[in-house]
UniProtKB/Swiss-Prot annotation:
Catalysed transformations (reactions): 1-O-(trans-sinapoyl)-beta-D-glucose + choline = O-sinapoylcholine + D-glucose
Pfam name, any one: Peptidase_S10
Enzyme class, broadest EC rank: transferase
Name of the protein described by the UniProt record: Serine carboxypeptidase-like 19
Disulfide bonds: C82-C353, C246-C260, C284-C320
Amino acid sequence: MRNLSFIVLFLLTLFFIHHLVDASLLVKSLPGFEGPLPFELETGYVSIGESGDVELFYYFVKSERNPENDPLMIWLTGGPGCSSICGLLFANGPLAFKGDEYNGTVPPLELTSFSWTKVANILYLEAPAGSGYSYAKTRRAFESSDTKQMHQIDQFLRSWFVKHPEFISNPFYVGGDSYSGKIVPGAVQQISLGNEKGLTPLINIQGYVLGNPVTDKNIETNYRVPFAHGMGLISDELFESLERSCGGKFFNVDPSNARCSNNLQAYDHCMSEIYSEHILLRNCKVDYVLADTPNIRTDRRRVMKEFSVNDSSSLPPPSCFTYRYFLSAFWANDENVRRALGVKKEVGKWNRCNSQNIPYTFEIFNAVPYHVNNSLKGFRSLIYSGDHDSMVPFSSTQAWIRALNYSIVDDWRPWMMSSNQVAGYTRTYANKMTFATIKGGGHTAEYTPDQCSLMFRRWIDGEPL
């Protein structure tokens, strides 16, 4: 009887674990892409939370080189609340939109030459619930926060590895960009602590990758003014007056300091028409792609009506970098696309970024302590910055890295493309942290994909940049 009870319990446990990750699908083709996919793509849901009330959606792309032995990385898009389609189709995945003008059909896709999946297995996760195709079954489960995300990522991974045991021994990394600068280092720490507590399966965590990482809002805000001056966006006189009147502090300014406030208003005026994610690019308005996306089966006139615009000139032209955001709204909401990806019927309309609709608590105001703890554990890290990003200036990232106070093992130098052209600049520290700038890059990798792909390939293979 005791043996029978044990067998029943064992079978129930296997059934429960299988149920957590049973909604997976091998995707052989996608609407918008001609022919079968030339890479292996799996999508699915993993149930997490106390009662399995959170359903996190993922895209898993196997490495094109040697998936059995190549590293595995989970990629977390910033936001919080932005879809991982941003990573898969905009940043470092194997597909991208062609950028043709929208004609009412499914936007066409094409292969990229710069995918990070050429050398690594990548798991693109839609987190927290409410991001992309992920959802929650109850209002309470829908609530999220910085620390809750970290715990859920750890829980997701251990459930996912149960279903994919062949990848347990692969070197594992956590990657992300923008607001994920707050989440990724904490998730690495959470995974490490889980391993130490004996949580199974053990995750072979080796390090993390961060692009243009939001780390400390005060530091980032403080470095925007000198960045703007260095880029010629404000005058010497205004910069010097800002330095004097504000005492070099440009955040939490004393409202009684009228001179500082007036100077900051002048600074804001100079920056108001600059595209902050990449100061050299055309400032295309993209507010409409952040709100509810339009009905797919509609003509151009109806599209403009739903976007509350009067003429086609109010829509971004295909030459605009952000036009791909417009296309993603139509692609991701197409019924055939959702069916091909295995999206559950409970999921409503897809938004590229759904931040305003997620009940989210911001708890981490400074992520530097997580970097300190991860350095003490001996984890590798790659931190990179586009040098034309004014949202999270590369100089602000350099500042908190210097504050870690680790000795330099490879000092500031250019790193080169294969064509012997300068791709950016790099420095490596004794805590196994590599910092790199991306020449001409913005917020984030998607603006200079060839350089970022080469940087990642060298770093993940243990080569110097």
